[in-house]
């Protein structure tokens, strides 16, 4: 009797095991079949995906901000894993990760988390530039070369909208600065009241080449010089998403100040984090050392839980010196900011508020101006580059600059925008206008 029971148990185990392996084999075969027309093998795609999420979960210093902004990271991770087999080529790989990183930020801009932008390639060589480590990386540049070819092919075949829709993206290319009209479109000027109030709207601080940068500087200097006899200069950054920080420093502040200005801010970081160590070793141009007492440093109540993710505080000081010869302007400067203002434009707003270079009017910016240098990661199989800030910039009140932005000196008056509020403020200061 016992022998029969043992035989039955063994038979059941054998049949069960065989059934399991048959089902597992069938499932694995079906799973592999999904990747038959994919850009890379299942293993390679999943390795790249895991690499990205390792950074998001263990290195990205703004993860908590994304969660507070409403992003469900676990759901996003599961949802996008299912989409991996749909990636067909370099263009779709690029758009897949652009879409993923946007969703992680709940469609906001938090700490410059993104793919390395194809529009940032060197316009002469079509190679990656300004990354320190990957500018001459053969695999990275090969990926971006093929990406450009795929983009051109999609445009020629009128497939751009279809592919963008597939990855839930709506992209607008940057203004073409390579033509004179393109450069002019970055500036809008008008005289609001002759010899009293001049207005300058700067839509970007981004330039692609040294040649364009020099043309940009020359044009901006010409505009500011033409306004030097005015009592009030209004600089509008409400549509400015940033670019090259040296442009606002060299082209606006230096020509207009009479004595050097000192700008100070702090960043938090985790000195033991593997990604931070890579950043310090390969991407940070100056030695990063904790020079503040971390434990006594107070985070704002709004982002206090984030403090446990860090162990160090570093204070930065930037000194901007007057340009000689300077622009002979002695009037008041007003800086308009809004929710779109970010990155280098946010840094300019923070500088203006701290140093009193300008009276800052509007609403909180989107931030991202106080996080220092960019950090780049190369995906192990595709060689796509992703980027992020690794240092956590802090406002003077201990709040996170990438979450709360820079607050203005004067908020918009009820029912009025920043320009209208600025003009009202000028009136109250005694300016005689006809508005």
Q: What does each model-found stretch correspond to?
A:
Residues 246-417:
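Conserved acidic, small-residue-rich alpha-beta core segments centered on
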Residues 4-9, 13-269, 274, 278-285, ...:
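Flexible, low-complexity junctional segments that flank or bridge functional domains
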């Amino acid at each position: 009797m016992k022998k029969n029971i043992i035989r039955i148990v063994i038979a059941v185990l054998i049949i069960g095991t065989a059934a399991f392996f048959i089902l597992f084999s069938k499932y694995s075969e079906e799973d592999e079949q999904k990747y038959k027309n994919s850009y890379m093998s299942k293993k390679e795609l999943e390795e790249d995906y895991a690499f990205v999420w390792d950074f998001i979960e263990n290195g990205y210093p703004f993860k908590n901000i994304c969660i507070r902004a409403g992003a469900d990271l676990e759901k996003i991770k599961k949802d996008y894993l299912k989409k991996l087999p749909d990636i067909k080529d370099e263009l779709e790989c690029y758009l897949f990760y652009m879409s993923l990183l946007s969703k992680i930020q709940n469609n906001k801009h938090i700490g410059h988390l993104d793919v390395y932008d194809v529009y940032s390639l060197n316009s002469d060589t079509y190679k990656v530039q300004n990354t320190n480590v990957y500018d001459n990386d053969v695999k990275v540049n090969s990926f971006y070369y093929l990406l450009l070819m795929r983009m051109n092919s999609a445009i020629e075949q009128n497939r751009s909208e279809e592919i963008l829709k597939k990855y839930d993206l709506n992209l607008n290319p940057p203004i073409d600065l390579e033509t004179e009209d393109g450069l002019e479109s970055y500036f809008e000027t008008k005289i609001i009241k002759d010899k009293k109030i001049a207005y300058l709207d700067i839509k970007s601080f981004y330039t692609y080449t040294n040649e364009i940068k020099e043309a940009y500087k020359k044009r901006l200097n010409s505009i500011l010089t033409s306004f030097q006899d005015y009592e009030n200069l209004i600089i509008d950054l409400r549509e400015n998403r940033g670019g090259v920080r040296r442009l606002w420093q060299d082209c606006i502040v230096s020509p207009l100040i009479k004595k050097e200005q000192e700008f100070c801010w702090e960043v938090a970081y985790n000195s033991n984090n593997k990604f931070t160590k890579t950043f310090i070793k390969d991407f940070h141009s100056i030695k990063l050392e904790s020079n503040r007492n971390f434990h006594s440093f107070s985070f704002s109540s709004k982002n206090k839980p984030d403090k446990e993710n860090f162990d160090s505080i570093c204070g930065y000081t930037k000194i901007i010196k007057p340009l000689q010869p300077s622009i002979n302007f002695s009037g008041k400067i007003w800086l308009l900011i809004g929710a779109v203002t970010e990155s280098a434009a946010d840094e300019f707003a923070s500088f203006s508020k701290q140093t009193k270079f300008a009276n800052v009017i509007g609403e909180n910016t989107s931030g991202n101006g106080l996080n220092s240098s960019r950090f780049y990661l190369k995906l192990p199989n595709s060689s796509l580059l992703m980027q992020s800030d690794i240092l956590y910039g802090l406002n003077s009140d201990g709040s996170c600059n990438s979450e709360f932005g820079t607050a203005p000196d004067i908020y918009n008056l009820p029912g009025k925008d920043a320009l209208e509020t600025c003009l009202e403020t000028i009136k109250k200061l005694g300016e005689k206008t006809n508005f």
